[in-house]
Amino acid sequence: MLLFLSTLTLTFQSCKGKSSSNLTAATDSLSDDALMDTVQRRTFLYFWEGAEPNSGLAPERYHVDGVYPQNDANVVTSGGSGFGIMAILAGIDRGYVTREEGLARMERIVSFLEKADRFHGAYPHWWYGDTGKVKPFGQKDNGGDLVETAFVMQALLAVHQYYAGGSPQEKALPATACRCGRQGLFPADCRLHSIGVRQGVPA
């Protein structure tokens, strides 16, 4: 695990153009706890600061320079957002933001997920974050995506467990997360899987 985290940190830091000797010295001086905190904090910040403003979800692409040649700054990814939701929960737990700030973000995210396009209960690969409408993944892939939906469902389970024992306001969030999850019972998807379709659910 430590080797994995060290490699991940080196990868992040190499983007800054430092020499490899400086990188080794920087990570060698970190304790295991400090290294874990660095990785978790930077992961959290990507999903917190880089979120699409309306939905609060993870962008499909994040251009540091703010230039989006394909005019897709508002496109969000369902699977990446599943990772992001769990990273935000970790960030709340570690005190990177207050519980109140975290709850407000989670309420925005879960509200978006409850209203966004779905197909037989499955979420699409991409949405337009400002509308919740599907952005087709390809010419013949404009419906639900089972793999990406699994990441969202896992995140909704984490939200439910994290807030289930919280304040009265926090306890309202698991109910919404459950409603989203219950819509994810996919008999149509199971039939598709049985005939060899692994990813797409038709629109």
State where each predicted segment sits.
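Secondary-structure capping and boundary motifs in well-ordered enzyme cores
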Residues: D32-L35, V39, A73-G80, G144-F151
